[in-house]
């Protein structure tokens, strides 16, 4: 049986308004604040800021 672990699945959603998103995991103990990272948005065809949203 697997242990519970300290990583949560999160959704990184584009701030360009295209609706594109990435899914990833983050360690909730070492990084309790919301994550914001610059990634490539293929719909906007440029690098934009992605912000953490709740994964439904």
Curated annotation (Swiss-Prot):
User: What cellular component GO annotations does this protein have?
Assistant: cytosolic large ribosomal subunit
The species is Verminephrobacter eiseniae (strain EF01-2)
Polar residues bias located where? 15-25
Q: Cross-referenced InterPro entries, in alphabetical order?
A: Ribosomal_bL33, Ribosomal_bL33_sf, Ribosomal_zn-bd
Q: Which HAMAP family match?
A: Ribosomal_bL33
Record has Chaperone as a keyword: no
Q: Name one GO biological process term.
A: translation
| Swiss-Prot/TrEMBL keywords | Ribonucleoprotein, Ribosomal protein
Full protein name: Large ribosomal subunit protein bL33
Gene Ontology molecular function terms on file: structural constituent of ribosome
Chain positions covered by the region annotation Disordered: 1-29
* Classification via Pfam families: Ribosomal_L33
State where composition is biased (Basic and acidic residues). 1-12
This protein's source sits in the domain of life called Bacteria
Q: Which family does it belong to?
A: Belongs to the bacterial ribosomal protein bL33 family.
